[in-house]
Amino acid sequence: MSINIEQAIIHEISQDSQGQLRCRLRPQPLLNSQAVEAMLEELHQTYSGKAGKGFGFFGTHGEDGEANPAFADGLSQYRSGDLGFVEFTGVASKLLQEELAKYDFSQGGFLLMSCYTSMTSDYLFVALLSAKSSMTVLDDMELSQNNHLDLNNIQLAARIDLTEWQADKDSRKYISFIRGRAGRKVADFFLDFMGCVEGVNIKAQNKTLMHAVEDFVSGSELTKDERQQCRDKVFDYCSERAEVGADIELKDLADELADSGMDSFYDFASSGTYELDEEFPADKASLRQLKKFSGTGGGVTLSFDGGHLGERVIYDPISDTLLIKGVPANLKDQLDRRLKG
């Protein structure tokens, strides 16, 4: 187990015969059974591996629009011991029900809330799960249809870093959330019921870091191979941080580079030219730019390792052309067949 579960509970929000949303509240937490542990471990791993998450914080009503403080207030009371876990999650369920009632598209679902510890941080995981129909074969070889929670396709989930929230009230990234496939609008109600306001632009921070790295190596006296080693070092460090759900720390990254003989990156990156936070989450999609060049347009898709630029792949910006030396065997075979045809 990579997590230590403190408490977990499930409440149901569903439509009644008149189409009105109703809450069915569980009166006690889930037992820490093997099934519960397996479910939460799977959700933790699935959520941690989700790319492109957004980050935010509890908004202040008035300063951050109409942010509802009720969820944060209830969470504060739970953390201080003034409100029980069951009572707090019941309040949260009612808040979600009220928010869902504003929209026509929602059918409700199962609200899962769990407090657990991973590494050195305490978390509150919040997810609205849906049921999925499946078929099974009974002992007498007859088919039977049943419903199960769809854990592999979570689209409405958030995780609050309770440790960061209570240690740094000015942080704007202690809440992470999944961006829905159809865009922010579908998930708005889920953020609104928690009073969450989007804070740090993670993609922008990661892209700025990539630009800083490129400018750093371009202005250095490093050889071509050493420059690529620097990019690889940054990629490896950031990827490792992403894998464990930890933030990129600018000073820590600079120390990693200094150990490899590439000094002064911290002073370079924090000089004011680049608006980089001292710490921010990693974005895997942005990090790939350190290892690969890729692009799509006009019916053409290209992708190649950065180390090939200037060797197997020659770019001429004046003629706007790419020359590829040593065409991949499977592509060459397709091209030869087409020419012969």
UniProtKB/Swiss-Prot annotation:
Belongs to the YejK family. It is found in: Cytoplasm, Nucleoid. Keywords: Cytoplasm. This is Nucleoid-associated protein Sden_2335. It comes from Shewanella denitrificans (strain OS217 / ATCC BAA-1090 / DSM 15013). Transmembrane segments: none annotated. PANTHER family: NUCLEOID-ASSOCIATED PROTEIN YEJK, PTHR38772. GO terms for molecular function: double-stranded DNA binding; single-stranded RNA binding.
